[in-house]
Structure formats: structure tokens, C-alpha cells
Amino acid sequence: MIKITLKDGSVREYNEGITIKEVAESISAGLARVALAGEVNGEVKDLSYPLENDCTLNLLTFDDEGGRDAYRHTTSHILAQAVKRLYPDAKLAIGPAIENGFYYDFDVEKPFSVEDLEKIEEEMKKIIKEDYKLERFTLPREEAIKFMEERNEPYKVELIRDLPEGETISFYKQGDFVDLCAGPHIESTGKVKAFKLMSVAGAYWRGNEKNKMLQRIYGTSFTKKSDLDAYITRIEEAKKRDHRKLGRELDLFDIYEEGPGFPFFMPKGMVLRNVLEEYWREEHRKAGYQEIKTPIILNEELWHRSGHWDHYKENMYFTKIDEADFAIKPMNCPGGMLVYKRKLHSYRDLPQRLAELGLVHRHELSGVLHGLMRVRCFTQDDAHIFMTPDQIESEILGVISLIDDFYKVFGFKYHVELSTRPENSMGSDEDWERATNALKNALEKKGIDYKINEGDGAFYGPKIDFHLEDSIGRTWQCGTIQLDFQMPERFDLTYIGPDGEKHRPVMIHRVVFGSIERFIAILTEHYAGAFPVWLSPVQVKILPILEKQHDYVAEVKKALEEKGVRVEADLRNEKIGYKIREAQLEKVPYMLVIGDKEMENRTVAVRSRKDGDLGPMRLEDFVNRIVEAIKNKEN
């Protein structure tokens, strides 16, 4: 008999060799119906997987990431089978589950059209109806290569050849279709209830632009049609909110062919950006940070010393000055190290919090560039906190509070992930354990739930990532807290302790916005361009009905400007309805309509973007109202 510990902590005994599906059936018929896979000792397996030893078992449904991934991975195999039926000469590449769906890459003679996707969807429906069982089998390396060569699948052969010696080479079969795959998968094709092919795009084999361009079909799938419909509605809403479209329409920012990945900010976009940066500076001053500015170009030797050369060289730009090699900074950290190192520090000076809005450049492939979300140059709101070991927890708690305050102002909810040591890391096991435990303790002291991302930390230390949830339910990773014992070592940073001896400080890297450009893109989509009044580039638009009201308009404008309100007057000889419609399209928070009555009574007729017609209001009352809304950063 073996002992199986379930998610609720209960322990059950079963015969050796019982499958995950049979365990689910022994618990309840309802659970067996919705179970898609099982997590055995932390590893996701098919329901047919036999349990031979004592283990922990978590039965996964579509509500669990592992269950969703298995379900969508199977849908990608159904897609591949449909494509092979319709286009027998198509060569298969890869087809994983991804966040919100799946994709499969194909090598085909001509790109897929929208009509092709419709045909493929119909074929997929047939395969689902045929309800093929997914069966896993393995082959020795040479047999696996021969098997895929006989099927004329060169990409699969390449993948097999690249697998380490001794690696288990597994395949999944459904009907007459077979694919190289590590799994896991759900039981049968008939279990897929609702799916949609979303789009097609070009993708280089293995992400390398020197390789052949393949056709990537994206799709998604759900266990309920209602959930699929809701997702498609969200996607349509996201298209309307696309920051690239709104950035142009609202005259905020754009990207031109002459500078792919290098954003241009227009006057209104600069207003928005400056408001964000001023808020950032104000809050950091209150939290005891000092602002610094470090150069964009620094000697190549510095990047060897920092470790970026070994871990980040492929993403860097280089230049020569006076025959010496220089690099354009991809990160602000090394500059911050030099600022700290410039003089001797006492333990009484610590913690020292150095903050920087630093412009960085990173080489990104043209295929992944996306508006302000993925660019080649951006401003990162970095800070580096240097401290004694006994200050670690209090400083992490302070950063968490600061980040929490920032996100609340914008109305964001968030979840937190703790990322641990990656393979290509620097430093000792002891340092990594100490750093990881410090982050865990701070989160637990704050009462914040968190998920662990094994192996996803930075190369110099573990990190906490903050994932914002926007108004249509999408998540965006923005804030980061990274604890680093390595960089102070590499730069030989010290402070004088109470014993009069030199000691090594500990350092936190952290960002709140992350990339300012990306944060602006997120805000633009979150608010659909209708920014709260404190962020709006134009907060008030004055709309006179006739030219004779222009003198009073100037008076109203001056009264608002004297209080720091950003205001424009539309003095064009156009009908008032047209002016109102245009101001609405510009998403201005307040419109003040001025006619003869308003001029005589020293009032303004107020229209709110949010609440519509608010009626007449004394000018002084409106000024007080909007000043209060701006001061309180009302959303």
C-alpha cells in the first residue's frame, strides 16, 4: 500500500499503481468529472499516471494553472492534427500552452488566411467530436529520431537531437496523429468544450531571426462556452483600449519608422509623463530617498565588473570613445554602485536610499516590439537601498508600503510573486537562502499572500514581483523588489560598523512603475484614455457659444490657471454641439459651456465626462471643486 497526501492535508492509502484518475473517482464522481490532471510532488502529470510510491497529490481542474495548461496544450495538439489533415505537407514545430491560451508554429508554403483559420476550426470540431484518447509512449533516442524522420518532421528531429543524453523522449498519440511532447495532457479530445482560433502571425523558429519564419496560430480554449464568450468580449474591449491607437488619437505618444522601439512623446503626453514623475519624486522625498542621475554611456569594464557582461551582453548596445570600448547602459545599477562608493560611509549613515529616473537602452528583436509596452529605450524608476543586515526586513517592509500606496492611487489591485534562484546565478547558497527568507518574512509580516516562482529570480538575487490587475482583468508585472548580496561584493562596497571595522552592506534594487513608458501604456489602457482629472493632460475645456463671450472665457481661464489647473479654450467659430463632441472624444474630464446667461451671472455650465450635465455653478465653486479633486487624486 502507498500513502497519498491530498491538498487538504488528509492522507489516504491505496494499492501501488493506482492512477490519478482512479484516486479522483475514489473521492467523488463530481471531482473525477472535472479533474484534468494531477500535481504529484509538485510535478503536473496526466490523469493516467500510475502512483507507485508515497506522494502528495493535488487534483487539478480548469481553475488551477496546471489544469488549464494541460487542457490548452491538448487543444494545441487538436489544432496541429487539424492542420495536418487539411495541409499534409505542413511541418510541425512547437505548440505550448501560454497565458490565456495556446499557439502552434507551422512551416507552410503560404501564410494562413482568416478563411484558412475558419476551415481549421471546423476540422478541430470534428476531431473533438471523434473523441480520441491521448496516449503517451516513449522511444529510445535513435528510434525517436528515425520515427520523426519517417514522418518528415525536421523540426521535431532537431528538437530530439538537442535533448540531453538519457532524457526520456515521449510522444502523444490521438487517432492517427502523433506529436513529440513531454505533456501533460487531458484524457481525450472530446473533453475540450469551447475553443477559438484568435489570430495568426509570423514567428522565427526558436525565436532567432536568422532562422526560417514560421506561421504561428494563436488560440484559446475554456471548459464553458460562456467563459470563452466573456474572454472574447474582453479581447474586443482590449482592442478598443489599445494604447497605440489611443496614443495617436489623444496626441500623447507615437513611434515612427525612423526609430523602431524608440518612443516619441507629444506635448500632451509629456504633461502626463511629468505629472507621474512629479508624483514619484514627491512620494520618494517623503519616504527618505535622495535622487541621483547617472550617465547613459559608461566604460565597458564597468559592465564586466557588475556581471551584466556575462548575463546581459546580447541585450546591450556598444560604442567607442577615444578608442576605448563603452556600453549604453541597459540597467541603472552599476551607476548607483559608483555613487555609493564615492565616499566612506558609517553604519549611522545607513540605510541610504538612492533613487533614479534613469534612461536605459536594451536591444529587443523587432518582432517583439509593441508600442510603449516593449521598446528599446525607456526610463526605469530605479532605487538602490544600501543597508546593514539587521535593516533588511524593515527596509523591505518600507518598500512594500511605498509600492502599495502608489498602486492604490491609480485604483489597481495586485498580486505578489516571489521568484527564487535561477540557474545562471551569482553567489553562494547561503546568501541566496538568507535573501529569499528575508523577502518571505517581510511578505508574511505584511500579511500578503504570494506565489513562488521557482528559478525566476534575477541573476544576482531573489525578487518580489507585483502584478497589477487592470480594469478589464488583465495582469501586468510592474513593481519589483530584488535583494542583492552580490553587487556590493563585486564593487567592494563597505561601511564602517560600530566596531570601527569595514563591513559589506546589503542592497535592495527596486522599481515601482518599472518602465515609465510601459506604465503610461498600462494606465492608458486601464482608463481607456479617460485619465482621472489629476492625470489628464487637459483638465478643463472652456466652450463659448459666441465670440462675444470670449472676454469672460479669458477671465474663467485665468482663474483656473492661477490655481494650477490645466485648461484650454475652444474659441473656434463652430456650433456648441460640435465643440462638446470633440471635447468628449478628447476625453477631457470637465467642459465649461459659456453663453450669455453664464456671462451675466458670473457662472459656468458644467459638463462632466463621468456624470454628464451638472448644470450651472458659480465660477468660484467650480474652481474649488476641481482643485480639491486634483489634490485628492480622485479616480
UniProtKB/Swiss-Prot annotation:
- Coiled-coil-forming residues are none
Locate the residues binding Zn(2+).
C333, H384, H509
- SUPFAM superfamilies tied to this protein: Class II aaRS ABD-related, Class II aaRS and biotin synthetases, TGS-like, ThrRS/AlaRS common domain
Q: Which InterPro entries match?
A: aa-tRNA-synt_IIb, aa-tRNA-synth_II, aa-tRNA-synth_II/BPL/LPL, Anticodon-bd, Anticodon-bd_dom_sf, Beta-grasp_dom_sf, TGS, TGS-like
Q: Which GO terms describe its biological process?
A: threonyl-tRNA aminoacylation
Phosphoprotein among keywords: no
For this protein, the record's Gene3D superfamilies field holds:
3.10.20.30, 3.30.54.20, Anticodon-binding domain, Bira Bifunctional Protein, Domain 2, Threonyl-trna Synthetase, Chain A, domain 2
- Entry EC no(s): 6.1.1.3
Gene Ontology terms, cellular component aspect? cytoplasm
Catalyses which reaction(s): tRNA(Thr) + L-threonine + ATP = L-threonyl-tRNA(Thr) + AMP + diphosphate + H(+)
- Locate the region Catalytic: 242-532
Molecular function via GO: ATP binding; catalytic activity, acting on a protein; metal ion binding; threonine-tRNA ligase activity; transferase activity; tRNA binding
Organism superkingdom: Bacteria
| UniProt keyword terms in alphabetical order | Aminoacyl-tRNA synthetase, ATP-binding, Cytoplasm, Ligase, Metal-binding, Nucleotide-binding, Protein biosynthesis, RNA-binding, tRNA-binding, Zinc
Q: Which cofactor does it need?
A: Zn(2+)
- Chief location of this protein within or outside the cell: cytoplasm
What residues does the TGS domain cover?
A: 1-61
Subcellular location field: Cytoplasm
Which Pfam families does the record cross-reference, listed alphabetically? HGTP_anticodon, TGS, tRNA-synt_2b, tRNA_SAD
Give the record's subunit note. Answer: Homodimer.
Q: What does this protein do?
A: Catalyzes the attachment of threonine to tRNA(Thr) in a two-step reaction: L-threonine is first activated by ATP to form Thr-AMP and then transferred to the acceptor end of tRNA(Thr). Also edits incorrectly charged L-seryl-tRNA(Thr).
NCBIfam families hit by this protein: thrS (TIGR00418)
Q: Which family does it belong to?
A: Belongs to the class-II aminoacyl-tRNA synthetase family.
Question: What name is this protein filed under?
Answer: Threonine--tRNA ligase
Q: Which organism is it from?
A: Acetivibrio thermocellus (strain ATCC 27405 / DSM 1237 / JCM 9322 / NBRC 103400 / NCIMB 10682 / NRRL B-4536 / VPI 7372) (Clostridium thermocellum)
Which gene holds the coding sequence for this protein?
A: thrS
